[in-house]
Regions:
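Short, small-residue-biased leader/transition segments that mark boundaries at the very start
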Residues: 1-4
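GT-A fold catalytic core of metal-dependent nucleotide-sugar glycosyltransferases
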Residues: 34-40, 54-109, 124-132, 138-140
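A short, conserved beta-to-alpha structural element at the edge of catalytic cores
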Residues: 98-119, 221, 225-229, 241, ...
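A glycosyltransferase accessory/donor-loop signature
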Residues: 136-282
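Short, surface-exposed amphipathic charged segments that create phosphate/polyanion-binding patches used
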Residues: 45-54, 112-117, 192-197
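Active-site-proximal specificity loops/subdomain of glycosyltransferases
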Residues: 16-64
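A short acidic, often aromatic-flanked loop/helix-cap motif at beta-alpha or helix-coil junctions
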Residues: 38-45, 106, 183-187
Length: 282
């Protein structure tokens, strides 16, 4: 039986959250270590409309944990486990930096062209799911180079996808490449164009291991009540976190998505109310 230790890197935690983490650890017979991060350490690094400073928790986790463990399965917060992770435990690293999953085909070509690395087309990975060889990471001492990349101090200039670009450049395609079942990218925006709400089954299949919910609308939003989000809800209902309500829209971008999805659900009065709030906030 494999021993698992979970690590959570966050910039916010309170007593209720810590209590829920403790309850989760007891329920699933695991250990959960919570690392509280001060955002000031990322003040000189770039952010964007879609990428906040929280994206740098990824590199921080690699650097910090490489002092004590040899491998790490990193998951973005919007990744949900649907299948068995056992195949990852059977990976034996040689000199590779990580086991990764190629990004969507359209992203592949665009990123290879943008970074002027033609051979990266087909091997540019999505950083939402990375099984990292921390022993190799530690030996290579990558963090100083990554910081230069992130600050735009290399020939690559400013990076559109921030640390995802930087990791792709630094790893230089020295990776084990896995099938997309380990990072099945799905956006709930698709539901706005699929009134049957069943087409997701063409993407999320019986073979899918990890679902990566990209985009503004996440499964934990109150307006995301679709069958495609059920995998998150199943996990939520089996955990202490079910006591917390689903998230409401707070940002302008979330409000815009909320009213559109409410209309898709046929909740027209709520949708109109949400639309008015969006217009006023905008």
């Amino acid at each position: 039986e494999m021993c698992i230790r979970d690590s959570v890197f966050t910039d916010y935690v309170d007593d209720d959250y810590l209590k829920s983490f403790n309850e989760t650890a007891k329920q699933f017979n695991t250990s959960i270590i919570v690392y509280l991060i001060d955002p000031k350490y990322f003040a000189d690094l770039p952010t964007s409309q879609f990428w906040s400073y929280a994206t740098y928790f990824r590199v921080l986790s690699f650097e910090y944990l490489s002092e004590s463990i040899s491998t790490l399965l990193y998951l973005d917060a919007d990744v949900v486990c649907k299948g068995s992770l056992k195949p990852l435990t059977e990976i034996i690293f040689k000199d590779e930096f990580a086991a990764v999953i190629p990004d969507n085909d359209s992203t592949q070509e665009a990123c290879a062209k943008r970074l002027n690395i033609p051979e990266m087309n087909g091997r540019y990975f999505n950083a939402g799911v990375i099984y990292v060889n921390l022993k190799k990471w530690h030996e290579a001492n990558l963090t100083p180079y990554l910081l230069k990349l992130l600050r735009g101090e290399t020939k690559y200039g400013s990076l559109k996808y921030l640390d995802q670009d930087a990791l792709n450049i630094a790893f230089n395609m020295n990776n084990i490449y896995l099938g997309k079942d380990f990072d099945t990218i799905y956006t709930l925006k698709n539901e706005l164009h699929d009134r049957s709400h069943r087409k997701f089954q063409q993407t999320i299949t019986d073979k899918t291991v990890l679902i990566h919910y990209t985009g503004i609308t996440k499964p934990w939003h109150s307006w995301a009540g679709y069958p495609s989000a059920s995998y998150f809800n199943i996990a939520r209902e089996q955990s202490p976190w079910k006591k917390y309500p689903l998230k409401e829209a707070r940002t302008v971008a979330e409000m815009q998505k909320q009213y559109k999805h409410l209309f898709a659900h046929g909740e027209y009065i709520k949708g109109i109310t949400s639309l008015i709030k969006y217009k006023l906030k905008k």
